[in-house]
């Protein structure tokens, strides 16, 4: 299969539920989701839960939560790999019956002794089972091994890495079924991908060598291979393997940081894929533009500054009401108190003046404190300094002058500039005390925006309160 649209596209995400959803898994899922959605295909979810000791319901839920937050909707029901163990055994038994696999009775001690001797002799430690061609079998525990080719080469035709040729002499007779009858991951993946109709396998390049081994199962069963695309991993900003010291590694950590999901999708899509020089784009553009040929061969680097810039671009272009809804979701996720109706309405009115230069949802909350907090204000230290006796006197005058003023930006600018002029001040000198009076803080949105958002009555009440400080 060489064409993106040779058959109805089916892609998958197949995480192991052994912890949080890693950002690398999220990006892989996003690439698969974009490709399927672009081609009108299916995107399916398989939970690879064969490691029963490490797989937990909580970790499975973490995967579902991460996908839901990122907006990666999948088709059909989630599939449990563990629940398909009978099917995996069935295929292994078929391969055994058809001569593509064999029973191996070698013990762990015998395998270890083989490798020790090979190492001592300077030979390859690749285990060569003496049972590969045996027909006389003892009554003893055994595993079922793939009968891998010993001669020639296997070519992985990869859309990202190009053709990769593997010498078959380097392939092991990998185990398909353990002695207790449970399937191995390497075997189960192939059976599941085939049965689920997966046409394109897009996964990390740490699985590239696995592909050469898994191709043998496809060949033995007479199944068509999927289109392979092995994508480079994500590194830290220093070029080393991504770890906690580089920043958050779990996708829900970004949700808890208040990164909007749309911004995260944009950033992750661009992390290892490109469409010309485009850095900032919408979901619709990503779906239209995404293709496998745009994925680079080199590892991408996590860059938190670039993520902040992407986030700022998306916040500035998001509908005000939608941003308030996202803030409510963020507060619920982090366990913070929910917005009251008054706070909800105030944020909605104020959002137009909060979005400028905001890099996260918490930034919006911080800028919006003037509509979230009630009087009396707990003035910050700088605000108290700004509200000196002279400033408080000017605020008292302004309170009287604003009583009957038309509540428009032009009128307010005229009144405040006239007040500054009458005291021989530039408006910037008056803006500080006004910010302090209207928000209780030294940093806030513009004075005029705050006055328009909170209205005449609340503005006058705040000016009066600040003017009355002693």
Curated annotation (Swiss-Prot):
GO cellular component labels: cytosol
Main localization of the protein described in the UniProt heading: cytoplasm
Coiled coil (residue ranges): none
Chain ranges passing through the membrane: none
Taxonomic superkingdom: Bacteria
Positions bound to ATP: 244
UniProt-annotated location(s): Cytoplasm
Keyword terms, alphabetized: Aminoacyl-tRNA synthetase, ATP-binding, Cytoplasm, Ligase, Nucleotide-binding, Protein biosynthesis
Reactions listed under catalytic activity: tRNA(Glu) + L-glutamate + ATP = L-glutamyl-tRNA(Glu) + AMP + diphosphate
GO molecular function, one term: glutamate-tRNA ligase activity
E.C. no: 6.1.1.17
Residues spanned by motif 'HIGH' region: 15-25
Gene Ontology process terms (BP): glutamyl-tRNA aminoacylation
Cited SUPFAM superfamilies: An anticodon-binding domain of class I aminoacyl-tRNA synthetases (SSF48163), Nucleotidylyl transferase (SSF52374)
InterPro entries for this protein: aa-tRNA-synth_I_cd-bd, aa-tRNA-synth_I_codon-bd_sub2, aa-tRNA-synth_I_CS, aa_tRNA-synth_I_cd-bd_sf, Glu-tRNA-ligase_bac/mito, Glu/Gln-tRNA-synth, Glu/Gln-tRNA-synth_Ib_cat-dom, GluQ/Sye
Disulfide bridge map: none
Motif ('KMSKS' region): 241-245
Annotated function: Catalyzes the attachment of glutamate to tRNA(Glu) in a two-step reaction: glutamate is first activated by ATP to form Glu-AMP and then transferred to the acceptor end of tRNA(Glu).
Family membership: Belongs to the class-I aminoacyl-tRNA synthetase family. Glutamate--tRNA ligase type 1 subfamily.
Assembly and interaction partners: Monomer.
Protein name, as recorded: Glutamate--tRNA ligase 1
The gene coding this protein: gltX1
